[in-house]
Amino acid sequence: MCGVVGAFVFVNSRFSVTVPYLERMRDTMVHRGPDGAGVWISPDARVGLGHRRLSIVDLSDAAAQPMANADGTLLVSFNGEIYNHAAIRKDLERTGRYRWKTDHSDTEVILHAFAEWGIECLERFRGMFAFALWDQARRELWLVRDRIGVKPLYYSVHHGRIVFASEIKALLEDPDQARAVHPEAFYHYLSFLTTPAPQTMFDGISKLAAGTWLRVRDSGSIEEHCYWDVWDRAEPLDSASEGEIRERLIASLRESVSLRKVSDVPVGVFLSGGIDSSTNTALFSEGEAGPVRTFSIGYEGDHASYRNELYYARRMAAQVGAEHHERLLNADELIDFLPTMVLLQDEPIADPVCFPVYCVSKLARENGVIVCQVGEGADELFCGYPLWKTTLALQRWSDWPVPAVLKRLGLSALRLAGRDRSPRYEWLRRSAEGEPVFWSGAEAFTEAHKQRLIARDFRRKIEARSSWEALQPVRRRFDEAAWDRSGLNWMTYADLRLRLPELLLMRVDKMSMGASLEARVPFLDHKFVELAMSIPTRIKIGDGRLKYLLKKAVRGLIPEELIDRPKQGFGVPVHEWFFGRLGERTRAELDRFCRDTGYFDRREVFRLIDAGAGVQVWYLLNFALWWRAYVAR
């Protein structure tokens, strides 16, 4: 896990890439790579690559980056891991065409794989990655993001050059980079708690979508291509029995966990006590000579909105004989963390779970662990959220042949009753407009509520009529390519394309890297995802219980009481904390923000605060703090 940065100057520009220019951007990301740093600049000063190193695989100086091949025609700056690099290296060694300068660097495998197979080498990579590769012979720059979007990559095209980095804050060190809010990204943030790729909250800065590459030529032409989509790989398992599918799932997940143990530094597991992290822990412990190291977070005191899961984490740790570590957090620590949080986020990631993710990452580092496996992805692949069951029922109702005129009459009645901010109104509106009920596994504000929340003058700057516009390309692809266009498959696919890569995985990446720790995600190995999306809906949800199939697959692997207890999820008791210092800080910050800017309607903001809408208020606070740190400075 590292930090990537660089620039490529087009033929119509006189700009020159210099060492101070690259180092200034690179060293905003020291936390991503505290173990070393490097810079390479082409002789004509038209191309530059920089790198911050967190040493994990092949710790030798020979594996430092940016790395060039033997004749200097290919150079790469790489963030992430290629878990199957040893197998690919053997294939390349058999050709006899390549000289190797490292013992087992996956970075060098990328260089020689590209030389051998071109960009099609991505088909062979199994891992999480974001990299920039310069092809000197063709004068082409390649920017690549992994299939699921575990690793980020941002870029900006301005003043005759493209500048790119693992973090936005690096791009902002370019003296010609503007700092302005993207109006439509802001509008979509209020729905999705994040911004949909390729947008970021910064006007003029883009992020590479998951499973996508860019090819940039010195003329300034940019070609974008989606090289992976799950519907190109999922093959329906219609003839397989439920038992056979369960066996395949566990075998695939066992392989995924095993691949993510490959490291030259200590590896541990984040353990919440839920099914996903407990399954990771059980599989990780198999074949280990020593105890697996596990890390958990809880909260001081009792909270109605979030109950500590430490009992279950300890229960799982004891079963596998883990070396278990845990820490209790409180509201004062969250308040103190807010400035660091928004700086690490780069753009608002409106999820208070950023706080415990950072703290558990720091706990692992303090105990000598550099890499941890995490449980993201299982809920989306196996219907793990209570809201999903409700949404599936609502979608079935929406599909009934009820005339649209009757649905619109219902909307009018709800408006007259002052209920147009409610989820019920939004669900009915989507049904009347022919939109799917489900947009995302996490939604902040309805379309009608956003119209009240956003200040009138700022609304005029927003061209989008609805945040459905951000999802329409995803829906078109689903309708064209999905082998089974069930409601459940749509929900999973929508979250694979937006919520996972741009919200859940970014909170993990930004916060873990803020503590200089690498996070690996076994449930989102692309082979496992392809298998999960090949399972018929009737088998995946069985009798209708949440995570029906996964629960049956892991019985005997983890304690029964962990499997059968109600779903809770990894959270933060912000509702209660808003009644103390956090609430005072929030009222003051949002009052100041509303008076200084024209983004929100102040009356609507304080209506939410007075109503105790803690989580929604958090989304607004996150944006206000980010704006002050990144835009108003």
How would you name each of these model-derived features?
Residues 369-379, 383-385:
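Short acidic/histidine-rich active-site segments
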Residues 105-109, 276, 330-334, 356, ...:
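Short, conserved alpha-helical segments within structured domains
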Residues 1-4, 10, 24, 43, ...:
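Adenosyl-5′-phosphate
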